């Protein structure tokens, strides 16, 4: 009886051992795979990856030959076989029906359809065996163990950690998520050493102008996705260009991939792998970095439709790192699934036989909110007012969109097809779309031209008899009033300009005090207060109702006037994603006001110091954003700018929590050949560098010191100085962080913050960077360029010296 009972157990063990062996041993000559059967894939030893037949999404009778993530529910495809299309350079995905066979025989790997015709082979011979590696790489090897062919060497749209793309290779996006044909975008590692993203004119392989390039012609070497999760482009001199900066999540805790998506964005993704990661994160792919950051704004091609199809526009969601293509009102997609084909009007196009009056009756210009097609202009008028701009487009049968720029009184006309459409929140112009009037009936439209031609002369005759006697007087009165108002406003604005430096790089808009008083509702809603004034929320009386923040300088002393001029001069000559944009100013007598773009998520101070910790990923995003902004001020402006008052209150967050540096009232501008300056003490207690209290020159390193304090506050979600803490040693964050770092107890700084604990390696890195920034000796502090490299993980961080004094500025 015992042997009989033991037999089933032995069979189970044999089955288990056989499956385990299949996942670990070499794939030998004679092995084969077929769709729709248990034996349809070869699995890596870790079971993380599989190579074989995968059903095409939405088509259970068609199969790809592919490599995929085997432990993820949706079996994400990372490689798929392609074959040449009619002998041309472009390729198509290999798709076969059930009954097809993939066989490793006679020293070669061959895929044949049910009729026995070969549909794919990797074109290598003398193959001894194959392997599905734990890296996701499928290899064919000779009997001597040398690699004959590998999937890593013939990439599709995705690369994985440990994968390298040498010169002459490329990634091709898919046409759709479910259509594996070559799509509209390519990432090329060119033979000339340049790494380039191209828009492609499908179905051909013709490239339009690149929308991103590394600009390394003659110097580029290879694109690397290393084992730590960093993606960079190496140069022939050994240096590196970071392509993404997200190499921070443990390879043991997350699956990683980088894919050229169907929208043209090269994104790096992670997926929770370990039990601990799955307990903290949703089991789905999460984008942690992207190139370009906002493709809607990046692609501006002279030929081609742009990021989306013709007559459509592109929108970008920064919180989800996604793009979307939409049609403007009264337009619809040619194909709702294949939106890249663009949009068409849902109404009959305007007839060129209509006279002006009939066109005005049948069509109107309706404003659309911050949507623009920047390269579709075919006519321009200036100077002109908005009413005339509308009229000129309505009566022109070619015109579909008009853009009126109020500051310059310029009108631009655009005709179909419209290209490079995007949603632009910074757009200050009024965009007008021509559509049929809603009151039009079909009979009215068809007969409008003849009817108005017939009646027009009678209408003109009657109205001229009735109004003829008074029109001249009315015209003269209106002209006098308008001319007087114009002269008054012009005089005030000239006075404002005369009080400012001639080379100040002023913003384009000069406001009157009355305009800003009206925009803020009488300075009613307070957003915040500072040493030199109060900031109010307002709304411009433009077509878009643009929200603004108005800083009203309250102090009338000479120092306040100086700060006002410094701020106008400083921000007026800067433009960067991580700097708050100055839209305009008012300088009427004692009234000094600055008009900024409105930041909907307030200051970092409010965001960071509350009862709930913001997500770790958002804090990292803010830290990187602030560092980029400071790098721009210190090293990338025409004149070096030292902010001098970096603190959380002066870092604002927009709709997508992008950090923007603000409040340049204490800033110092240095000529190109000058690196330090002498000035009085500036800044805010707790963030001021020690050299402010010494008789030495001030350099950009004072901002680096302040950034070190802010970085620690971002890590720990607490202020630098907190008097009401249980442990006196924790009162001053910079002291406590140094002690924790020296003792190897960084975890104490983020106790109770599960996300930070999970990313403890990056927490340790950020703390080390902060301690370098907080060195008392300015020359010991890194530049912001070096800070960026350390935060990104691009360079090793040596152990920072123990600073002799963090808060000498508090004494």
UniProtKB/Swiss-Prot annotation:
The gene is LECRK2. One of its GO terms (cellular component) is membrane. Keywords: ATP-binding, Disulfide bond, EGF-like domain, Glycoprotein, Kinase, Lectin, Membrane, Nucleotide-binding, Plant defense, Receptor, Serine/threonine-protein kinase, Signal, Transferase, Transmembrane, Transmembrane helix. The keyword Kinase applies. Residues 292-344 form the EGF-like domain. It is found in: Membrane. This is G-type lectin S-receptor-like serine/threonine-protein kinase LECRK2. Residues 24-464 are extracellular. GO terms for biological process: defense response; response to other organism. It comes from Oryza sativa subsp. indica. Residues 1-23 form the signal peptide. Its EC number is 2.7.11.1. PANTHER family: G-TYPE LECTIN S-RECEPTOR-LIKE SERINE/THREONINE-PROTEIN KINASE SD2-5, G-TYPE LECTIN S-RECEPTOR-LIKE SERINE_THREONINE-PROTEIN KINASE LECRK3.
């Amino acid at each position: 009886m015992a042997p009989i009972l033991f037999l089933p157990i032995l069979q189970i063990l044999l089955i288990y051992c056989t499956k385990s062996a299949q996942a670990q041993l070499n794939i030998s000559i004679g092995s084969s795979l077929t769709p729709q059967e248990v034996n349809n894939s070869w699995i890596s030893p870790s079971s993380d990856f599989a190579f074989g037949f995968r059903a095409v999404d939405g088509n259970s009778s068609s199969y790809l030959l592919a490599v995929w993530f085997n432990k993820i529910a949706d079996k994400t495809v990372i490689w798929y076989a392609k074959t040449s299309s009619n002998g041309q350079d472009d390729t198509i995905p290999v798709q076969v029906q059930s009954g097809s066979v993939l066989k490793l025989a006679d020293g070669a790997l061959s895929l044949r359809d049910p009729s026995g015709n070969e549909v794919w082979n990797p074109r290598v011979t003398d193959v001894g065996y194959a392997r599905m590696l734990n890296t996701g790489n499928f290899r064919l090897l000779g009997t001597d163990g040398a690699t004959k062919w590998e999937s890593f060497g013939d990439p599709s749209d995705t690369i994985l950690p440990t994968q390298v793309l040498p010169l002459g290779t490329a990634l091709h996006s898919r046409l759709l998520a479910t259509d594996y044909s070559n799509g509209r975008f390519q990432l090329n590692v060119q033979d000339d050493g340049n790494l380039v993203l191209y828009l492609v004119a499908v179905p051909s392989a013709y490239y339009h102008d690149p929308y991103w390039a590394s600009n390394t012609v003659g110097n580029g070497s290879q694109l690397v996705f290393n084992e730590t999760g960093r993606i960079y482009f190496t140069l022939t001199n050994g240096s590196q260009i970071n392509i993404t900066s997200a190499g921070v999540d443990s390879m043991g805790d997350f699956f990683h991939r980088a894919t050229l998506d169907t929208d043209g964005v090269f994104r790096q993704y992670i997926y929770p792998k370990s039990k601990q990661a799955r307990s903290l994160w949703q089991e789905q792919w999460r984008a942690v970095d992207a190139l370009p950051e906002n493709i809607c704004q990046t692609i501006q091609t002279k030929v081609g439709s742009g990021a989306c199809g013709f007559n459509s526009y592109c929108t970008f969601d920064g919180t989800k790192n996604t793009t979307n293509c939409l049609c403007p009102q009264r337009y619809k997609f040619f194909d709702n699934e294949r939106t890249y084909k663009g949009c068409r009007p849902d109404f009959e196009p305007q007839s060129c036989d209509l006279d002006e009056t009939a066109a005005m009756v049948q069509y109107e210009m309706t404003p659309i909110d911050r949507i623009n097609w920047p390269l579709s202009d075919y006519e321009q008028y200036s100077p002109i007012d908005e009413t005339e701009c509308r009229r000129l487009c309505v009566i022109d049968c070619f015109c579909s969109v008009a853009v009126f720029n109020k500051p310059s009184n310029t009108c631009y006309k655009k005709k179909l097809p419209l290209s490079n459409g995007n949603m632009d929140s910074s757009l200050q112009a009024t965009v007008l779309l021509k559509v049929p009037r809603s009151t039009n009936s079909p009979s009215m439209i068809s007969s409008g031209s003849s009817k108005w031609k017939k009646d027009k002369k009678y209408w003109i005759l009657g109205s001229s008899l009735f109004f003829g006697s008074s029109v001249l007087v009315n015209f003269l009165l209106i002209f006098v009033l308008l001319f007087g108002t114009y002269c008054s406003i012009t005089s005030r604005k000239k006075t404002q300009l005369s009080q400012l430096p001639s080379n100040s790089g002023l913003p384009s808009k000069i406001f009157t005090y009355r305009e800003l008083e009206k925009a803020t509702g009488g300075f009613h809603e307070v957003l915040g207060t500072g040493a030199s004034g109060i900031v109010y929320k307002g709304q411009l009386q433009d077509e878009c109702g643009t929200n603004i923040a108005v800083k009203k300088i309250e102090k009338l002393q000479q120092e306040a006037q100086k700060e006002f001029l410094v701020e106008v001069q400083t921000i007026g000559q800067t433009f960067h994603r991580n700097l708050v944009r100055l839209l305009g100013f008012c300088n009427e007598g004692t009234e000094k006001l600055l008009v900024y773009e409105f930041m909907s998520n307030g200051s970092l101070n409010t965001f960071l110091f509350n009862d709930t910790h913001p997500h770790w990923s958002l804090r990292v995003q803010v830290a990187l954003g602030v560092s980029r902004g400071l790098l721009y001020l210190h090293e990338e402006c025409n004149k070096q700018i030292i902010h001098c008052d970096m603190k959380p209150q002066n870092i604002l967050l927009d709709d997508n929590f992008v950090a923007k540096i603000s409040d340049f009232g204490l800033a110092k501008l240095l000529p190109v050949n000058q690196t330090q300056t002498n000035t009085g003490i500036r800044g805010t207690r707790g963030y001021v560098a020690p050299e402010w209290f010494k008789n030495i020159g001030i350099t950009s390193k004072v901002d680096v010191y302040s950034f070190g304090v802010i970085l620690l506050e971002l890590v720990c979600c607490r202020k630098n100085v907190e008097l009401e803490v249980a442990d006196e040693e924790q009162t001053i964050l910079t002291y406590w962080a140094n002690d924790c770092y020296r003792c190897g107890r960084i975890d104490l700084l983020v106790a109770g913050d599960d996300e930070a604990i999970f990313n403890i390696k990056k927490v340790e890195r950020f703390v080390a960077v902060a301690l370098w920034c907080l060195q008392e000796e300015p020359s010991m502090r890194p530049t912001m360029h070096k800070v960026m490299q350390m935060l990104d993980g691009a360079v090793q961080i040596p152990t920072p010296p123990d600073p002799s004094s963090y808060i000498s500025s508090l004494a």
